[in-house]
UniProtKB/Swiss-Prot annotation:
Gene3D superfamilies: L-arginine/glycine Amidinotransferase, Chain A. The active site is at 171 (proton donor), 276 (nucleophile). The gene is DDAH2. This is Putative hydrolase DDAH2. Coiled coil: none annotated. Putative hydrolase with unknown substrate. Does not hydrolyze N(G),N(G)-dimethyl-L-arginine (ADMA) which acts as an inhibitor of NOS. In endothelial cells, induces expression of vascular endothelial growth factor (VEGF) via phosphorylation of the transcription factor SP1 by PKA in a process that is independent of NO and NO synthase. Similarly, enhances pancreatic insulin secretion through SP1-mediated transcriptional up-regulation of secretagogin/SCGN, an insulin vesicle docking protein. Its main location: cytoplasm. One of its GO terms (cellular component) is mitochondrion. InterPro entries: DDAH-like. It is found in: Cytoplasm; Mitochondrion. Phosphorylated by TBK1. Phosphorylation inhibits the translocation into the mitochondrion upon Sendai viral infection. Belongs to the DDAH family. It comes from Bos taurus. Keywords: Cytoplasm, Hydrolase, Mitochondrion.
Length: 285
């Protein structure tokens, strides 16, 4: 059976999607977001892909940019993946729903079992779903409703699934993440702390917690691309981003920290976990 939580972060592949020019031409402004430097955003995205491939040793699958999908690089919202199963989401924004098509095909090609939501009353953004290795928490937010959370529970029946109110405009994973199999990291805002308190009440598992000054710093990815026994990685915001949170992240001594910047992509609403999907095509014990 193994140790509870040991499946967290197991991965062999990462999926990303290129940054289209349309990301800088109206989509952000229409959403009230600041102007975006396209070249810088594309550089950030290229560095992220390089770290996933070279530093973490993952097989990188890169979908081409599509001008009709300005927010296509935020493909973390399009699927929830655990083991060999991928739940294709139904994003809250109707304009984003075509983003799932290319992701679905890529995941099928990698051999994952595809589950469709199939309920027009459900909304689900993938970055509202936090998997701890033992259970799922689904943020009930502007982006994700109760029906979406119910479909997560129906899809991943081997795990407990609990809902957590998100009281800000963020997704759940924009407020908290996993710094290890037993450690929840969270921002210091009231919304982030409320979410962590709710999770503590709902869970049957004890998690340590680490509070970071910046909510966005808690949007990190705990990854174990190697074989069991090798040190895991924590892909996190750094490289000049969120300097106030870097010292606190050093307290996570059981991981190798891999910093990456996405401050320009953040202007389009991207958090770190929205910019890639990680999965394992290796057999699971």
């Amino acid at each position: 059976m193994g140790t509870p939580g040991e499946g967290l972060g197991r991965c062999s592949h990462a999926l990303i999607r290129g940054v289209p020019e349309s990301l800088a031409s109206g989509e952000g402004a229409a959403a009230g977001l600041p102007a975006l430097d396209l070249a810088k955003a594309q550089r950030e995205h290229g560095v992220l892909g390089g770290k996933l491939r070279q530093r973490l040793g993952l097989q990188l699958v890169e979908l081409p940019p599509e001008e009709s999908l300005p927010l296509g690089p935020l493909l973390g919202d399009t699927a929830v993946i655990q083991g060999d199963t991928a739940l294709i989401t139904r994003p809250w924004s109707p304009a984003r729903r075509p983003e799932v098509d290319g992701v679905r095909k890529a995941l099928q090609d990698l051999g994952l079992r595809i589950v469709e939501m199939g309920d027009e009353n459900a909304t689900l953004d993938g970055t509202d779903v936090l998997f701890t290795g033992r259970e799922f928490f689904v943020g009930l937010s502007k982006w994700t409703n109760h029906r979406g959370a119910e479909i997560v529970a129906d899809t991943f029946r081997d795990f407990a699934v609990s809902t957590v109110p998100v009281t800000s405009t963020s997704h759940l994973r924009g407020l908290c993440g996993m710094g290890g199999p037993r450690t929840v990291v969270a921002g210091s805002s009231e919304a982030a702390q409320k979410a962590v308190r709710a999770m503590a009440v709902l869970t049957d598992h004890p998690y340590a917690s680490l509070t970071l000054p910046d909510d966005a710093a808690a949007d990190c990815l705990f990854l174990r691309p190697g074989q069991p026994g090798l040190p895991p990685f924590l892909l996190h915001r750094g490289g000049g981003d969120l300097p106030n949170s870097q010292e606190a992240l050093q307290k996570l001594s059981d991981v190798t920290l891999v910093p990456v910047s996405c401050s320009e992509l953040e202007k389009a609403g991207a958090g770190l976990s929205s910019l890639c999907l990680v999965l394992s095509t290796r057999p699971h014990n």
